[in-house]
Regions:
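Flexible, glycine-/basic-rich loop-and-beta segments that form/coincide
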Residues: 41-156, 160
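Conserved Class I SAM-dependent methyltransferase catalytic core
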Residues: 1-40, 47-54
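Charged, often flexible domain-edge or linker segments that flank or initiate folded functional domains
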Residues: 143-187
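Generic preference for hydrophobic/aromatic residues in regular secondary structure cores
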Residues: 28, 73, 78-79, 100, ...
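Context-gated lysine
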Residues: 8, 19, 24, 40, ...
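Residue-identity detector for glutamine
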Residues: 14, 21-24, 67, 116, ...
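Generic hydrophobic/packing signal
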Residues: 3, 15, 26-29, 48, ...
Length: 187
């Protein structure tokens, strides 16, 4: 499990490359969008911040994803590409990640505000931040302990060593060669 505190642009950027790459490695377990004022006393500015909780994929899921990437059938989760619009009373709109609406994990009220760079998203504080965080943490699932399988780990290690040996020898899989005793074997 990994927890990141990031700018809203990780989740809201129209270019979804960062989210896409993250989705190949881990599942987004939970996330919360903090009010613009969450770090005002520390940073001296209003900035929308997200807390993202990821859990690394199991080896079987990772294998499945790699297979689908290889045959160009990988379908990223919706939080990678789904953006919603929010508009003010004058029709000025801003895009943001649909995940936060779908999961109701916004620690405040979304609105559009004018800035020196045009219109931008704002999250107005509606209650003390600690209340939002306490409610949110109760929604994060508990993770079961991962069972350690020494045979699987050893088999994976041996496969990696064999692959490295082949790569370092400069030989190709399927080639017939001689070992140290002069016996023929297939790589």
């Amino acid at each position: 499990v990994a927890i990141f505190v990031v700018s809203r642009y990780v989740m809201d950027a129209e270019n979804s490359y960062t989210r896409y790459e993250a989705s190949k490695l881990a599942s987004l377990v939970s996330a919360i969008r903090l009010p613009s004022s969450a770090f005002k006393s520390e940073a001296g500015t209003d900035v929308i911040t997200d807390i993202l909780v990821f859990k690394r994929h199991s080896s079987s899921t990772e294998y499945s994803i790699n297979q689908s990437l290889g045959n160009l059938t990988y379908e990223a989760p919706y939080w990678v590409k789904d953006l919603s619009n929010i508009a003010d009373e004058n029709g000025n709109s801003v895009k943001f990640n649909s995940y936060f609406l779908d999961n109701k994990n916004i620690a405040g009220r979304l609105k559009v505000k004018s800035s020196q760079f045009g219109f931008t998203l704002d999250v107005a504080e509606t209650a003390p931040l600690i209340e939002h965080l306490n409610r949110w943490t109760l929604t994060i699932p508990e993770f079961a302990d991962v069972e350690y399988n020494p045979q699987e780990t050893n088999a994976n290690f041996e496969a990696i060593v064999a692959h490295l040996y082949i790569e370092m020898s400069g030989k190709q899989i399927g080639v017939i060669d001689r070992n140290e005793k002069g016996e023929l074997y297939r790589i």
